[in-house]
Amino acid sequence: MMDQARSAFSNLFGGEPLSYTRFSLARQVDGDNSHVEMKLAVDEEENADNNTKANVTKPKRCGGSICYGTIAVIIFFLIGFMIGYLGYCKGVEPKTECERLAGTESPVREEPEEDFPAAPRLYWDDLKKKLSEKLDTTDFTSTIKLLNENSYVPREAGSQKDENLALYVENQFREFKLSKVWRDQHFVKIQVKDSAQNSVIIVDKNGRLVYLVENPGGYVAYSKAATVTGKLVHANFGTKKDFEDLDTPVNGSIVIVRAGKITFAEKVANAESLNAIGVLIYMDQTKFPIVNAELSFFGHAHLGTGDPYTPGFPSFNHTQFPPSRSSGLPNIPVQTISRAAAEKLFGNMEGDCPSDWKTDSTCRMVTSESKNVKLTVSNVLKEIKILNIFGVIKGFVEPDHYVVVGAQRDAWGPGAAKSGVGTALLLKLAEMFSDMVLKDGFQPSRSIIFASWSAGDFGSVGATEWLEGYLSSLHLKAFTYINLDKAVLGTSNFKVSASPLLYTLIEKTMQNVKHPVTGQSLYQDSNWASKVEKLTLDNAAFPFLAYSGIPAVSFCFCEDTDYPYLGTTMDTYKELTERIPELNKVARAAAEVAGQFMIKLTHDVELNLDYERYNSQLLSFVRDLNQYRADIKEMGLSLQWLYSARGDFFRATSRLTTDFGNAEKTDRFVMKKLNDRVMRVEYHFLSPYVSPKESPFRHVFWGSGSHTLSALLENLKLRKQNNSAFNETLFRNQLALATWTIQGAANALSGDVWDIDNEF
């Protein structure tokens, strides 16, 4: 064919030997077959087999313009012809004439990839059904009972039995084939009873012994070790209002208060702020209907969380931090006493307790003139090693983003309700979710971390130390904490405490889960969000929210009254099953609530955190502040900039909602950027203007300290109620820093710096 083409070309020009162009489409070594190479051959063929030159007669020259035009047309024709011809050769079998003429080697034949069928994607309804099926076949009570056996009871933090249970949890995580299992150890200081007994004694005015009231079996950790003597004054629950309502001053006196309503630490702090010299805490029969009047109980008095001797930094060994002490430690002795001991004290006191206290008829207000009470506390510090145990199911798309599910493991006493139920739920959820991933095709986009904490009884020490140790690693990675502690304390009510970011998720979950006894939906009140209580200091979810800025949720099935045996030696499996006969059903419902949280948070492309909920929180704060607009104006201040910051936050949430609506849900890069903006919201409500060491709970809504919005309002109220106590300089700082914190949250939600509304 090439010879024929050459012959035609030569004849056209009268046989004159001219240059011609060869196009080689040979496949290159690097696999690029689109390269075109041009070569010029003059006077002779590349394959001149006969080695003869063509003898031609020199023709007459044609007109220049006609010749050049004709040449151009023919060249283009030949180019098209050769490209088409060689293109056709690619479609024939290897080693054909076409391939040899093109001068190419046969391409390496690639083995076809085996076509495995893709696992079908599981949707929300599928996953909800699979979770329900697994819950139906799970026996929670046997695990709770196992954790209450002698080998694990009692399991005070740092004890051998606490470690035994830690190793059991670790082995279980490994048996469940989680993606990874590891442990985290800390060296912390706790307070324990000394060999010298604590005591409560009645003495006369000269300090002589009248009689011993009690050598209590329980104690209050982190009490000051001291002996004090003074009159005894009853202050109901020890709230601020209770102290305000008292007719008798408490300065220089020992205060006796009822357990409940607020934490031990808050009771002690309130008493100490009014110069009380000691505190006694008892459980009255009205609120805690326990038959055994001699029952002792345990608690702690640290107004904070974590190791109080390493405030704001982790308790790792050999960290060489200078000696430090939390400002939340009390400077007065504190002791729990039995109801029987309290009644003995009331026998030496005068004045009936107010009827609106709704307490025991034996209650009295103050000791008689001739008698005092002597309190001796001899607790000592002890350094212990604690273990936190972790297991993770890694996400398939965003493994670096994770929800943390945790439960306290230790307990003073048997701890069936306090830590046994939570640990059992943790183990069963880890087993079920691992099974769903390994066998049922569940592919969570984000990771799930299961955490078993130690030293929870001493103020969420294990959880807080982990947060302090890994705060920078957790930032914008851990996006929710689900607390399983004390999830089953009754059957009558379902109560929840959480960050507003989780309210929408909670509402949807309540609509999906049925009450374990009545069979009705947990969602019974459309106004439920207004009744949500703040997370308290004794809740392990609190440091996640207030210290780390991680949205957190804690929930329970419970009664209107407190569970009476928490922190006592009667917190046993036997008492738990007697009070809650349908324990397995209630535990199943608690696991279903937590399980649905976990699925929605790790499965959906859009993060299930409702950032718009904070608009109503900010609006509520501004409304409260507006009541004092005249006072603010008198100080020469304006709320204009606060309004502007609040408006910027509202606009930022609206823009983000629009961005989510316009985003292509299958574009993971875009969705991740949007989700990252959502994850910043809670964190940026941590005040950047206070030290984590001095004020660890920096959240302006849910933390504690002068930087909080509630503290700002409390200070401002004093301008009318008690002007001498009002601190105007403090208020000016509070208002300015609160405004900038809100503005910072709005800026973070806006995204990139060029998207921020800079009119502020």
UniProtKB/Swiss-Prot annotation:
Against Pfam families, the record matches this protein to: PA (PF02225), Peptidase_M28 (PF04389), TFR_dimer (PF04253)
Q: Please, one GO biological process term?
A: positive regulation of isotype switching
Topological region Extracellular: 87-760
Report the PTM annotation: Stearoylated by ZDHHC6 which inhibits TFRC-mediated activation of the JNK pathway and promotes mitochondrial fragmentation. Stearoylation does not affect iron uptake.
Glycan attachment sites: 251, 317, 722, 727
Cytoplasmic side of membrane: 1-65
Lipid-binding residues (covalent, S-palmitoyl cysteine):
62, 67
Kindly state the positions of the motif Stop-transfer sequence in this protein: 58-61
Q: What InterPro entries is this protein classified in?
A: PA_dom_sf (IPR046450), PA_domain (IPR003137), Peptidase_M28 (IPR007484), Peptidase_M28B (IPR039373), TFR-like_dimer_dom (IPR007365), TFR-like_dimer_dom_sf (IPR036757), TfR1/2_PA (IPR037324)
- Post-translational modification Phosphothreonine, affected residues: 21
> In UniProt terms, what function does this protein have?
Cellular uptake of iron occurs via receptor-mediated endocytosis of ligand-occupied transferrin receptor into specialized endosomes. Endosomal acidification leads to iron release. The apotransferrin-receptor complex is then recycled to the cell surface with a return to neutral pH and the concomitant loss of affinity of apotransferrin for its receptor. Transferrin receptor is necessary for development of erythrocytes and the nervous system. Positively regulates T and B cell proliferation through iron uptake.
- PANTHER family in the record, alphabetically? N-ACETYLATED-ALPHA-LINKED ACIDIC DIPEPTIDASE, TRANSFERRIN RECEPTOR PROTEIN 1
Protein name stated in the entry:
Transferrin receptor protein 1
Species:
Pongo abelii (Sumatran orangutan)
